Amino acid sequence: MEPSPALAWLLLLSLVADCLKAAQSRDFTVKDIIYLHPSTTPYPGGFKCFTCEKAADNYECNRWAPDIYCPRDTRYCYTQHTMEVTGNSISVTKRCVPLEECLSTGCRDSEHEGYKICTSCCEGNICNLPLPRNDTDATFATTSPINQTNGHPHCVSVIVSCLWVWLGLTL
């Protein structure tokens, strides 16, 4: 019995269609990011962010983002997402920023009717992969305390005073 050429063509077309579906994925995964993360940095604590200015959507931003380290005077990755009320992206901006630019995260309605702007910041290497789409996503996520001081002089004086009183009472 001879195999049918029609069946062979059907199987071949099915295989090609599956390959095309896989090739048109429009989102990055964490595995993709692993390949972008080198083992050395140009300075201690060096990090990267996805960077783009007014890209059409998240895919276009992340796809063409330059693979460079953020300047030393920055500490966070910033993302601003402008979208229609339906959720369709209008504009995506991502960059490295200092703390001051991360103090107003959240979502707000734009002056243009029907637009919503959500802003988020994060701390970490290439942490700004996803887009903020609502108040739950539009946050300021840090891995370390924002207000880091070199010490607490008031606490030290209280401890010393307590020790002085304790030593004075036990003598």
UniProtKB/Swiss-Prot annotation:
The molecular function terms in GO held by this entry are: acetylcholine receptor inhibitor activity; acetylcholine receptor regulator activity
User: Would you list which residues are glycosylated?
Assistant: 134, 147
Q: Where is the lipid attached (GPI-anchor amidated asparagine)?
A: 147
Its annotated function is as follows: Acts as a modulator of nicotinic acetylcholine receptors (nAChRs) function in the brain. Inhibits nicotine-induced Ca(2+) influx through nAChRs. In vitro, specifically inhibits alpha-3:beta-4 and alpha-7 nAChR currents in an allosteric manner. Acts as a positive regulator of Wnt/beta-catenin signaling.
Membrane topology qualifier: Lipid-anchor; GPI-anchor
Query: In which tissues has expression of this protein been reported?
Result: Expressed at high levels in the cortex and cerebellum of the brain, at moderate levels in the lung, kidney, and liver, and at low levels in the heart and prostate (at protein level). Expressed in neurons (at protein level).
Q: What is this protein called?
A: Ly6/PLAUR domain-containing protein 6
Q: Give the chief site where it resides.
A: secreted
Its keywords, alphabetically, are: Cell membrane, Cell projection, Cytoplasm, Disulfide bond, Glycoprotein, GPI-anchor, Lipoprotein, Membrane, Secreted, Signal, Synapse, Synaptosome
**A single GO cellular-component term on record:** neuron projection
Q: List the disulfide bonds.
A: 49-77, 52-61, 70-96, 102-121, 107-118, 122-127
From which residue to which does the signal peptide run? 1-25
Per UniProt, residues of the UPAR/Ly6 domain are 47-141
Output one GO BP term.
Answer: positive regulation of canonical Wnt signaling pathway
Q: Which domain of life is it from?
A: Eukaryota
Q: Would the keyword Repeat turn up in this protein's UniProt record?
A: no
Q: Which species expresses this protein natively?
A: Rattus norvegicus (Rat)
What does the UniProt entry state concerning the protein's domains?
A: The UPAR/Ly6 domain is sufficient for inhibiting alpha-3:beta-4 and alpha-7-dependent nAChR currents.
Q: How is the quaternary structure described?
A: Interacts with nicotinic acetylcholine receptors (nAChRs) including CHRNA3, CHRNA4, CHRNA5, CHRNA6, CHRNA7, CHRNB2 and CHRNB4. Interacts (via NxI motif) with LRP6.
- The propeptide sits at 148-171
Q: Where is this motif: NxI motif?
A: 88-90
Cellular localisation = Secreted; Cytoplasm; Cell membrane; Synapse, Synaptosome
Query: What are the transmembrane regions?
Result: none
